[in-house]
């Protein structure tokens, strides 16, 4: 059972917390992580690429020349694919790139991502994080107190507006509501910060 130090936002150690072994202490499943991250990245694609077929290109209703007697190859439309400005054959059409992922697989991927950060000693526990005003310097002060890397994601049980605004100016740091974070985001950041509320959420949802 992994045991981590619990800090306050001033960077002072409060106590030690024993985390649930079934969530934070499993052996990360690399194949599941690969599959789920690929699926989540695919779902982010807009899928709006579109080309026009010969039926959709403007013009081309009239036969360019008569069928026989000219010595040239027969043509039915100046918008046929072989013509300059003609329609595209088998071009992209709007589609969804989303891939179905089973709920149990998603949960295993979340557990694997969290356990990976525990093994890498990149998981930080904080009792709570709040800022009195929506100022970036207050959030930077908290990050410095906790000795956080520039590329860190902070997971809270509910996002405070001041905290969200205070972190928006930092390109490498992100504050997310724990219920909204993806496996891809968890793995993209070097350090993961969990509040006690976020840990409780995972223990309720993933067990």
From Swiss-Prot:
GO cellular component terms listed in the entry, alphabetical order: ribonucleoprotein complex; ribosome
GO biological process: translation
Gene name in the database record: rplD
Listed SUPFAM superfamilies: Ribosomal protein L4
Key words, A-Z: Ribonucleoprotein, Ribosomal protein, RNA-binding, rRNA-binding
Family affiliation: Belongs to the universal ribosomal protein uL4 family.
Gene3D superfamilies with a match to the protein in the record: 3.40.1370.10
Any GO MF annotation of the entry: structural constituent of ribosome
Keyword Metal-binding: no
Assembly behavior: Part of the 50S ribosomal subunit.
Region (Disordered): 47-78
One of the Pfam families matching this protein, by short name: Ribosomal_L4
Reported function: One of the primary rRNA binding proteins, this protein initially binds near the 5'-end of the 23S rRNA. It is important during the early stages of 50S assembly. It makes multiple contacts with different domains of the 23S rRNA in the assembled 50S subunit and ribosome.
Entry protein name: Large ribosomal subunit protein uL4
UniProt keyword annotation of Ribonucleoprotein present: yes
Matches recorded under InterPro entries: Ribosomal_uL4 (IPR002136), Ribosomal_uL4-like (IPR013005), Ribosomal_uL4_dom_sf (IPR023574)
Biased composition (Basic residues): 60-71
